[in-house]
C-alpha cells in the first residue's frame, strides 16, 4: 500500500523495512525496532542507522538477537551494529520480555520448577535490548 507512512503532521508512522527511505521528512522523536534488524544484512542495518542519525532521531529502542547467522551465511551481531561511542545507552541488557514465544514448535520449552510449560518455547538465541539516545553524526 502506498499510504503506509503517515502524513508529515502525524504523531506515529509505521514503516516496513523496504520503504524506510519513504518516511516523511523531519526529525524522529522515537524509533523502535524489534526482532527485524536480526533478519537484515549488516549493510542494511547500517543504512537504517545512517537514516536515523540523518533524521536526528532522539531516542532509538532496539531489541534483536545478540547473534544470528543469516540464510546467506553472514553472521550478524547486535554489538557490531553501527553504534557510536558518543551514543548514550539508557538501557543496555538482555531483554526480559523477549526471550520466549507462544506456539507449537520443536524449540526448547520454558520450564518452571522443572516442569515444561505447554506451548511456551525459548528462542534459540538471547535477545538484547537498548534504549539509546543516538549521537548525531555518521
Model-derived regions, located:
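S-adenosyl-L-methionine
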Residues: 1-24
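Short, conserved loop/helix-junction motifs that constitute active-site signature segments
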Residues: 26, 51-56
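A conserved beta-strand element that flanks and buttresses the S-adenosyl-L-methionine
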Residues: 32
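Short catalytic micro-motifs in class I SAM-dependent methyltransferases
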Residues: 35-36
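A short, conserved alpha-helix within the catalytic core of class I
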Residues: 39-52
